[in-house]
């Protein structure tokens, strides 16, 4: 069985292999939408509409204009929600290709007119940036380097719009082998679990939000 990895899938597995297996592979359970996830989806859609079509932000999101307006005004080749995939040999492929190994969808991607520099951004609607994970930007940078060979530098940002914080990170093409090696190692842990058929649960404070009701650590058991 070939697996298509992503930042969120890797994080799910590392958080709890049992949950990853039940939800993502066996598909016995589905993660339920919450007020927070629905809000995040609405913000993402509003930002995309503003950047691509100039649609005004809804009044509820008006205070976020300070984040999205500079993105829309950048003099560059701007793409929103561009689906990218790479194969296990680190070559580019389509998001839905049969041999896709890693997938990524940056919320925002802008490639400079020279083609040398790219900017990626991911919108966050959480109430704190304390545990911001720039690894997401790192993986997106790798995707950009592979899909856009002229790009030699990627400037990334996690935009925590609710709390008004921006977490930045920057990557160069020289770092690409190291980045790919790191993510290959993280993916190997999932592939190893698949090979041996062992998906141990990992108890944490997040168990109360988990949809896997059959697990011994589920809050209802």
Per-range role (PLM):
Residues 24-26, 35-37, 59-62, 76-83, ...:
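Short coil/turn segments at secondary-structure boundaries
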Residues 2-15, 96-111, 174-181:
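An acidic intrinsically disordered interaction segment
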Residues 4-5, 86-92, 98, 129-132, ...:
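Metal-dependent nuclease catalytic regions and adjoining charged, substrate-binding loops involved
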Residues 45-120, 126-130, 135, 147-157:
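Catalytic cores of nuclease domains that cleave nucleic-acid phosphodiester backbones
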Residues 1-2, 18-30, 116-121, 186-194:
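Short amphipathic alpha-helical segments and their helix-coil junctions
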